[in-house]
Amino acid sequence: MTKQLSRRTLLGALVAVGPAAALARVVGAQAPATPPAPPQPMTGPVFGAPPTDFKPPYPEAGKVNRLDPRLDALIDADAKVEKVCDGFLHAEGPVWVGGANGYLLTSDTQVNHIVKWSPTEGRSIWLENSGYDANGVGWAPNLREPGTNGLILGRGGLIAAGSGARSILRIDLATKKKTVLVDKYMGKRLNSPNDVVLGPDGSIYFSDPPAALVNRTGPDRELDYAGVFRLAPDNSLHLIDTMSAPNGIGVSPDGTKLYHTDGPTGWVVWDLDKQGNASNRRNFVARSVVMGGDSLKIDTAGNMWAATRGAVTVFTPGGEPIGSISTDEGVSNCEIGADGYLYLASSTRILRVRAKAKKLMFKVT
């Protein structure tokens, strides 16, 4: 990722597919002695710089890399990677809302905003205090990512992995009211939920690393492990497994597999039963193929579109890499829009590329 992202847990070099680069070791800052003040407005890659009002033709900011002819069914060889929006400190969790004429919502984790972008209206702040708020919800002395992270549609609204709120949130798309769905497991506060996905039965699966905490071993951390969880439709919370660095998460189109990107140990997959319970954990993509790995999306054909630090890499349902979309700033997440584009959360900006994939969305009653 970028310089700003070097403060995150960088588990590997900016790679898509290929030989492993050297691991970068990041030393976190010490916890402040007094509670932190609310973050100052940061509106661009340079502190105080206003976002750029991009208009078509959008500037190019990346390239498509074809590793296998099967990529042609998903992305044209001459597809352009366009920069449509900037002004983020750290973009995460993009989600497309509506049909072809809809809009994109994206978390700015360190600024505590959710940003809205559409081709017709451009960029605007959709929600301030998206995670940590003025009432101190989600406050911790060592909190460094006050905002939301992963975003999905579900339960009649927007479901957010609230890194700053240290909870899973439901945000009403009309009123923008936040409701905490869960913030504790067995009486102990969650670490900082990172990525989130909806299962076919309405279960919400999420990863919970301590990534939003400056001091990850400090007294505000109540769970002594990082985990992958399932929030059942009845709002009961179940621990699926403990992981070293849980991050991206996704569900297969038939609802029988749960995927997860854990950088230090490689990516894994579980089997899911009809009640959403996970079992039979096994390797999916070896650590030797991708070092690190961030958030991901699964399309309707079962292909995985995974942020692999410097790119979004496309994997077949069997875990074979067939191509990537690389950038010069790194990528944390992506989204398959209903407008025919794949959107990339690329550090300080949003990129897009024409794609033929269709977004996987379960119709949960």
Regions found by a protein language model. Name each.
Residues 2-3, 9-29:
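N-terminal export signals
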Residues 8, 17-20, 58-61, 65:
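Low-complexity, intrinsically disordered regions enriched in charged/polar residues
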